[in-house]
Amino acid sequence: MRLERVLEEARAKGYPIEDNGLGNLWVVLPRERFKEEMAHYKAMGFNFLADIVGLDYLTYPDPRPERFAVVYELVSLPGWKDGDGSRFFVRVYVPEEDPRLPTVTDLWGSANFLEREVYDLFGIVFEGHPDLRKILTPEDLEGHPLRKDYPLGETPTLFREGRYIIPAEFRAALTGKDPGLTFYKGGSRKGYRSLWADLKKAREVKG
């Protein structure tokens, strides 16, 4: 299969291979060889670029070579141009001080909007893109919202069925350090902690 050839070539060239044990494999390409290798994968028969995602490792617990990375999902679609169903990911690290990569829109048309999304949300510039501009955020929004150091505004949000979430408490709950969900009850807010105390008290009374 094509995937076996990809892995054999990666090992021979000294490219790291990452395996999450769940059937997903990443080949880590050096930025200076990225476009050349992507063109090679296209010629090899990876006829579909399924996705492109940006990553910011600013607060990641394990050290990475660079703050940013871009991941590409390549597929050899069966039944189209002799595809055999092979699938793997390409990861390329991008330095914070020079966040640029060459575009792959000339190889896969599906890269057009995907690269624009990564550019908009992470600020990674894809050189040679035919129309590199914002795609999700307002034109007057400064910065890139998926960068870990982007200053997010916070507004308490009332959801359907009376659920009320306060951002700071919600974040606390996600860390596991403190209950975070609160509820909107008849014009007042009753925190999760208070509801839990009421439940414990009711259980004690019940015996």
From Swiss-Prot:
Native source organism of the sequence: Thermus thermophilus (strain ATCC 27634 / DSM 579 / HB8)
Identification of the protein by name: NADH-quinone oxidoreductase subunit 5
Top-level enzyme category: translocase
Record keyword Phosphoprotein present: no
Predominant location category: membrane
Name of the coding gene: nqo5
Membrane topology: Peripheral membrane protein
Subcellular location: Cell membrane
Oligomer and partners: NDH-1 is composed of 15 different subunits, Nqo1 to Nqo15. The complex has a L-shaped structure, with the hydrophobic arm (subunits Nqo7, Nqo8 and Nqo10 to Nqo14) embedded in the membrane and the hydrophilic peripheral arm (subunits Nqo1 to Nqo6, Nqo9 and Nqo15) protruding into the bacterial cytoplasm. The hydrophilic domain contains all the redox centers.
